[in-house]
C-alpha cells in the first residue's frame, strides 16, 4: 500500500538526516501543502490537485511517523469508525420512517454527532 511505502521512504531519508527535527516543522509543512492544494483547486487543474493532494498525504504520514502512529492502522481504525457512525445515521433515519436521500445534511450531521458522542 502507498501509505506503507511513504513511511518506508521517510524512514530511509531520516536515517541519513533528511528529516524535520520536530513536530512543529512537520505541522508547518502540512499547512504549506494544504495551502498549495487550495491553490491547485482554484486553478482547476486536476493534475496539480492530484500532485498536491499526494504531497499533503505524504506529509500527514510523516506526522504520523513523528508521533509513532502507524498510518495504515490509524486509517483502518478511522474507516471502521466511519462505517459504524454512518450505519447509525442510516439506521436512525430508517427507524423514523425516512429515507437518507431525503434527509438534509444538517439532519444527518445532528445524527452523526449523536453517534460520535455515544
How should each PLM-predicted stretch be described?
Residues 1-53, 57-118:
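Flexible "arm" and connector segments at domain edges
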